[in-house]
Structure formats: C-alpha cells, structure tokens
C-alpha cells in the first residue's frame, strides 16, 4: 500500500467481474484502480474513463502491466482457463490477488496455488460471494457442531441460450460448461456451508457439443469423509434462475432458497417438522472489495480462501471425469 494506506489495484480483464468488483475498489476509500490490462481496446478505454485511469497505465498485456506498474494487488476477472497463469504471475510479483471463480480449471494448478499462498504472507481471495451472504453464513454456523449427513442442491438458469456465443460456452476458455460456471457457485455453497470433506464423485451430464466438453445439465453425487452424501443438480437449459439447498442432520435441516440473484432466504426445520425463519440482515453484507481489503489489513484469512476453491475444483474435475467414464472418481486434495 501507499503511505496513505491506499491499496493500488491493477485490473486484469474488464468484463462483468472486472467492472463490478473493480468499481468496488474504485469506490472504496482505502483502494484505487491504478492500472488496467484488457485485450479489447474499446472496453479498455471505457473502463479507463470509469475508473479515471490515465492512458500511460493502460495495457493490452497483463504481463507488461505487472512489470511496469507499482501495484499492491490485482483483480483477475478473465475467462476461467486464464486464471492460473495470471494468479501465479501476480504472486510472483509479490502482489495480493483477488481472483474470480473458479481459482483454476486444473486440479494440479489449484493445488499449486493453494500451497503457494498458504506458505506466504500474501492474501488470495476467490470470488465466491456466498461466503459474504448472511443467509449462507447463518446456515454454516448452524452446522459448526453437528455436520449434515444428507444434502440436496439444485440451480437452474437460461445459461445455454444466454451465453451461446460467449466465451462461457467455449471450453478452451471456460474449462467446461454450466457446472464450471454458475454450477461452481452451487458446489462451493454446499461445500462451504456444510464444512464437509469430499472423497468421491459420480456424475451424469448432458452435453451441448459433439466433443462432450460443454455441459448444459449435470447430476452430481458426492460422498464425504463422514459418510454424508449430496445430490447436486444443475441445469442451464431452463427459463429462469432458481436455487435450492437443503442440508439435514439428526436434529433437522436448513433450507436456503431464492430466485434470480436476489438475497436468499434461510429456513430452519426442527425434528418436529416445525419451520423457523432466523433473522438475517442482508444490509450488513459487505462487498468483495471490502472483504479483501479487510483481510489484507488484518492479515487474516479472506472469506473465500484458495483451499475453499481447491475443493470446488476437485469436485468439478471429478464430475467431468465421471461423466465421461461412467465410473466413480476418488478425490484427493493434497
């Protein structure tokens, strides 16, 4: 940081994440966007105008930005398969890193980043926003002392029609399909909320391409270390967004439900089948930039860590392998 305590952030990519989270850094009193790397000239200029970045700090190559600018942190908001190289480059330059999900689309890459960060004083936060959502925080607290043993989770979206011509349906950039995109948030939500360690995965997928790389629908069965199971369903070929997660233990359940991207509702169910709706103040939710800056200042773990993201990549990669082979796939995180 500068002497004034301002975090100098360089943006890599100015798509949705780059502009939204970049805007959070721009608006925060303790951070500023000082440089931008974007291959699209029009988007680069638009972002520069929005964030008041001078021409001499605009780049079409992120490596040139890292070499040429005095930065404290980078925001990686590029297509999924590019994350690994850009994250590693940022760490090599001694920077803190905010990376959109997923952390990586290769399990060995995710392991490498996790090992690297956990042995350093650099902060890496992954953009899984459920970790900041009071509904999911409430559910996670419910299972701190009694782990769930039966989980169901599903999310639907008009993903295929919406992104048919976008990088998200190009597996060379996305790493896969619906499961690696919107589905990644669902997997992260159930893994983080439950606190369980996955051990094996079985999956069946419907692919939208002849090469069987871009899934439009997936059914994923997960086994956990404590014997619990999860049944996860994602569909990107339906008309709207709905999300439902149900986690059961011997005392009852927690249900998290919502539509589109509005705040989620959490409901607790006791052993007598009585529903309770705990008070959840969504106004207290901090944004991603705020959480990232706080973690750096306090030298504390960010809300969504590299190890959290490693679990998601492990389950996701196992699901694709299982869908292609028809076999259960064991998961090894280390």
Residue ranges and their predicted role:
Residues 115-123, 134-150, 222-224, 249:
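Basic phosphate/pyrophosphate-binding loop/patch that engages nucleotide-derived ligands
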Residues 1-52:
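N-terminal Rossmann-like dinucleotide-binding module
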């Amino acid at each position: 940081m500068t002497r004034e305590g301002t975090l100098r952030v360089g943006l890599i990519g100015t798509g949705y994440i780059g502009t939204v989270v970049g805007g959070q850094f721009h608006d925060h009193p303790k951070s500023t966007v000082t440089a931008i790397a974007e291959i699209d000239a029009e988007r680069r200029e638009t972002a520069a105008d929005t964030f008041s970045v001078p021409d001499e700090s605009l780049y079409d190559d992120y490596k040139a930005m890292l070499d040429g600018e005095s930065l404290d942190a980078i925001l990686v908001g590029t297509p999924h398969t590019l994350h690994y190289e850009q994250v590693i480059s940022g760490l090599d330059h001694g920077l803190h890193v905010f990376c959109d999900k997923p952390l990586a689309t290769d399990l060995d890459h995710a392991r490498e980043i996790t090992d690297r960060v956990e042995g350093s004083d650099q902060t890496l936060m992954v953009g899984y926003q459920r970790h900041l959502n009071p509904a999911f925080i409430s559910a996670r607290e419910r299972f701190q002392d009694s782990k769930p043993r039966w989980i169901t989770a599903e999310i639907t979206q008009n993903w295929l029609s919406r992104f048919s011509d976008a990088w998200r349906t190009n597996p060379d950039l996305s790493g896969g399909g619906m499961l690696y995109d919107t589905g990644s948030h669902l997997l992260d939500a159930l893994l983080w909320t439950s606190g369980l360690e996955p051990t094996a995965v079985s999956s069946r997928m419907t692919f939208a391409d002849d090469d069987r790389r871009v899934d439009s629908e997936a059914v994923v069965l997960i086994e956990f270390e404590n014997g619990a199971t999860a049944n996860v369903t994602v569909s990107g070929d339906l008309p709207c967004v709905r999300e439902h997660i149900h986690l059961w233990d011997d005392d009852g359940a927690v249900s998290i439900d919502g539509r589109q991207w509005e705040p989620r509702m959490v409901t607790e169910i006791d052993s007598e089948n009585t529903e309770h709706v705990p008070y959840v103040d969504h106004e207290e939710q901090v944004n991603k930039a705020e959480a990232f800056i706080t973690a750096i200042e306090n030298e504390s773990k960010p809300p969504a860590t590299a190890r959290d993201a490693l679990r998601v990549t492990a389950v996701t990669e196992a699901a694709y392998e299982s869908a292609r082979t028809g076999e259960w796939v064991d998961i090894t995180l280390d």
